[in-house]
Amino acid sequence: MKRFFIFISLHLLLFLIVIAYQAQASEDGWTINDDKDYIYLTKNGDVIYGDKLIFSMDYNDCDKLYHLFTFLTTKAPDDVQQFANKRIPITLNDMEFSAEVIHIQPILNNRAYWVMFALGEYETEKYVKLLSGFIKEHKRYEIVLADGLNFEVEKYFDITRNSWRLDKFSEKFAETYKRCKEKTTHKDS
């Protein structure tokens, strides 16, 4: 009976830890990270949690914004590497675009791949205003990988769509931009 009680207690504790973590993570879901050269504002996906929407700025030029996203695939054959530096068709909230594959990282002994895409490089203030207007009109930011010339998306990706809620984007981006500018100012001093 004592073992059963310990077993139940441990499972209950684990359950509470998981629930508490999820509640904390779902509060706004944004993460600000940096390294020596860049600062990143990221948000995990709603469909595949590990997929990220990324806004990045170089400390040398905070007025230039890089908009990136990642998709994880466990379906891609070995020839997935052929798409590095190529543009792949996507839809972004039902509007047709393309995104450049800028990095493919094999993981799990080459049984899966992280694929990083670039949507582009933009003037920070203009792009953030544009995106803030977009957020007011749409509840979600949804990216769907699409078929293209010599590219069948289902051959390479098991899950072809993800979405992100961009609640509190403006506030979090303002904080990220401020930190970028502060570090740039400290570098110049």
Tell me the role of every PLM-derived stretch.
Residues 23-189:
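A generic "folded-domain core" signal
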Residues 1-25:
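Classical Sec-dependent N-terminal signal peptides that target proteins to the secretory pathway
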